[in-house]
C-alpha cells in the first residue's frame, strides 16, 4: 500500500512540476493547453512564465550535523533523537522519527549538531550521497547529513521531491578522495524552482499531505509489527 501511495505522490510531483501540467485557472493542464513558457538559463529548460529560480539557501536553512564523543557514555542513551545515514539506509522510508541511538543533552551540547524541527528534510551528504527522508519528530543528525529547514514548513514535501528529482546533479557536486561529500556551500548555491501558480500549489500540498499522513500511519504500524516479530522470533526458536 505504501509503495502505491508513493507512486501516486511522485506522479503528482512529476505531472505538475516537471511536465508543468498543473491545473490552470480553467482546470486544464497548463503546458498541454498552451500555457506560456520561458527559457531559464540556470535550469537549462523552459519553465512557466512568471516562475522564479532561487538559490537553495534562500528557500531553506541548511544545517550540518555532528557526533558526540563515543568514548563518553554519558553522551548517549538520552531522549534526543539522533539520526545517521545507516538509519535511513536500514529504514528505507520517506519519513524518519527514530534512530538506532539517542543522545543526551550533554551529548548534544558537546558537539556542533543542530536541532531540526518536525518536517525538516534530511539528506545524506556522504557515504552515500542522496538518502533522503522527512523528519516526523524533532531530530538531530551526525556529520553525514546536510539538512534543510524550509523557510515555510509547508514547502517540505515539495523540497523532498525536488531534491530527489535532482539527486544526480547533487551527487555530481561531491568532492573528496576517500569518499565523495557534498559541501554546504555548494548546496547553498544549488538552484531551486519556486512555483508561481500559488492556487495550484496550495491544492498540490493538500493532496500530498493527505497521502503523506496515510503513509506515516502505515510506516509506524509496520515498524511496530517488525519490532514485535523480532521480539517473538527468538522466543519461538527457543520453544517458549
Report each predicted region and the residues it spans.
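A short beta-sheet element
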Residues: 84-86, 100-166, 173-175, 183-185
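Short, surface-exposed recognition loops and adjoining beta-strand edges that mediate ligand/DNA contacts
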Residues: 17, 23, 27-31
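Non-catalytic DNA-recognition/assembly elements of restriction-modification systems
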Residues: 1-16, 32-67, 189, 198-240
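Extended non-membrane alpha-helical scaffolds
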Residues: 21, 49-56, 61, 71-73, ...
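Low-complexity, Lys/Gly-biased intrinsically disordered segments
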Residues: 25-28, 44, 49-94, 107-111, ...
Amino acid at each position: 500500500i505504501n509503495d502505491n501511495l508513493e507512486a501516486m505522490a511522485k506522479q503528482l510531483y512529476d505531472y505538475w512540476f516537471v511536465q508543468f501540467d498543473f491545473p490552470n485557472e480553467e482546470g486544464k493542464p497548463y503546458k498541454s493547453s498552451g500555457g506560456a513558457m520561458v527559457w531559464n538559463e540556470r535550469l537549462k529548460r523552459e519553465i512557466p512564465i512568471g516562475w522564479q529560480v532561487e538559490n537553495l539557501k534562500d528557500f531553506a536553512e541548511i544545517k550540518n550535523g555532528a557526533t558526540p564523543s563515543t568514548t563518553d557514555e554519558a553522551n548517549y542513551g538520552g531522549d534526543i533523537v539522533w539520526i545517521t545515514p545507516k538509519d535511513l539506509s536500514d529504514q528505507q522510508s520517506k519519513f524518519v522519527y527514530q534512530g538506532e541511538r539517542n543522545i543526551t543533552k550533554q551529548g548534544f551540547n558537546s558537539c556542533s549538531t543542530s536541532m531540526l524541527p518536525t518536517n525538516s528534510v534530511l539528506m545524506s551528504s556522504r557515504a552515500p550521497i542522496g538518502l533522503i527522508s522527512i523528519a516526523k519528530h524533532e531530530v538531530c543528525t551526525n556529520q553525514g547529513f546536510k539538512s534543510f529547514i524550509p523557510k515555510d514548513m509547508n514547502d517540505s514535501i515539495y523540497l523532498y521531491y525536488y531534491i530527489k528529482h535532482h539527486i544526480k546533479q547533487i551527487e555530481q557536486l561531491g568532492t573528496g578522495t576517500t569518499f565523495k561529500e557534498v559541501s554546504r556551500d555548494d548546496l547553498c548555491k544549488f538552484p531551486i524552482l519556486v512555483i508561481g501558480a500559488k492556487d495550484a500549489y496550495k491544492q498540490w500540498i493538500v493532496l500530498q499531505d493527505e497521502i503523506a499522513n496515510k503513509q506515516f500511519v502505515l510506516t509506524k504500524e509496520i515498524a511496530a509489527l517488525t519490532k514485535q516479530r523480532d521480539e517473538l522470533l527468538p522466543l519461538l526458536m527457543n520453544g517458549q
